[in-house]
C-alpha cells in the first residue's frame, strides 16, 4: 500500500510541469498588468508579476 502511494505521489509531482512559466522582458508592478501581455504573446491570460517582470503560464 505504501509503495502504491509513493508511486502515485511521484507521478503526480512529475506531471506538474515545472517549466511551464515563460518569462518576458515586460516590467510590471502588479500581476493584472501581465494579463494583456500574456494574451498577446502566448494566447493565454494567465500571468503574474515576479521580480518586476511578467511571467506567463
Curated annotation (Swiss-Prot):
Reported effect, residue 32 to A: 14.7-fold decrease in affinity to Kv11/ERG potassium channels
MF terms in GO: ion channel inhibitor activity; potassium channel regulator activity; toxin activity
Protein origin, superkingdom: Eukaryota
Localization, UniProt: Secreted
Outcome of mutating residue 53 to K: No loss of activity. No loss of activity but gain in inhibition of native calcium- activated potassium channels with Kd of about 72 nM
Record keywords: Disulfide bond, Ion channel impairing toxin, Neurotoxin, Potassium channel impairing toxin, Secreted, Signal, Toxin, Voltage-gated potassium channel impairing toxin
Outcome of swapping residue 39 to A: 86.4-fold decrease in affinity to Kv11/ERG potassium channels
Annotated phenotype, changing residue 27 to A: 2.7-fold decrease in affinity to Kv11/ERG potassium channels
Function description: Blocks human and/or rat Kv11.1/KCNH2/ERG1, Kv11.2/KCNH6/ERG2 and Kv11.3/KCNH7/ERG3 by binding to channel outer vestibule (S5P domain) with a 1:1 stoichiometry. Inhibition data are the following: hERG1 (reversible, Kd=7.7 nM, IC(50)=3.3 nM, IC(50)=11.9 nM), rERG1 (reversible, Kd=19 nM), hERG2 (reversible, Kd=77 nM), rERG2 (irreversible, Kd=4.2 nM), hERG3 (reversible, Kd=11.5 nM) and rERG3 (reversible, Kd=747 nM) potassium channels. Also has a minimal effect on rat ELK1/KCNH4 potassium channels (9% inhibition at 100 nM).
Additional detail: The inhibition potency of the toxin for ERG1 decreases as temperature increases (IC(50)=7.6 nM and IC(50)=15.3 nM at room temperature and 37 degrees Celsius, respectively), likely due to changes in the structure of the channel binding site. Negative results: the toxin (at 100 nM) does not inhibit hEAG1/KCNH1, hBK/KCa1.1/KCNMA1, hSK1/KCa2.1/KCNN1, rSK2/KCa2.2/KCNN2, hIK/KCa3.1/KCNN4, KCNQ1+KCNE1, KCNQ2+KCNQ3 and KCNQ4 channels. The toxin (at 50 nM) does not inhibit Kv1.2/KCNA2, Kv1.4/KCNA4, Kv2.1/KCNB1, Kv4.3/KCND3, Kir1.1/KCNJ1.
Domain description: Has the CSalpha/beta fold, which comprises one or two short alpha helices connected to anti-parallel beta-sheets stabilized by three or four disulfide bonds.
Protein name: Potassium channel toxin gamma-KTx 2.1
Protein species of origin: Mesobuthus eupeus (Lesser Asian scorpion)
Amino acid at each position: 500500500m505504501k509503495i502504491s502511494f509513493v508511486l502515485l505521489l511521484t507521478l503526480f509531482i512529475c506531471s506538474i510541469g515545472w517549466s511551464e512559466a515563460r518569462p518576458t522582458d515586460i516590467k510590471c508592478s502588479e500581476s493584472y498588468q501581465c494579463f494583456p501581455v500574456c494574451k498577446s504573446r502566448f494566447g493565454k491570460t494567465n500571468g503574474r508579476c515576479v521580480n518586476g517582470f511578467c511571467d506567463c503560464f
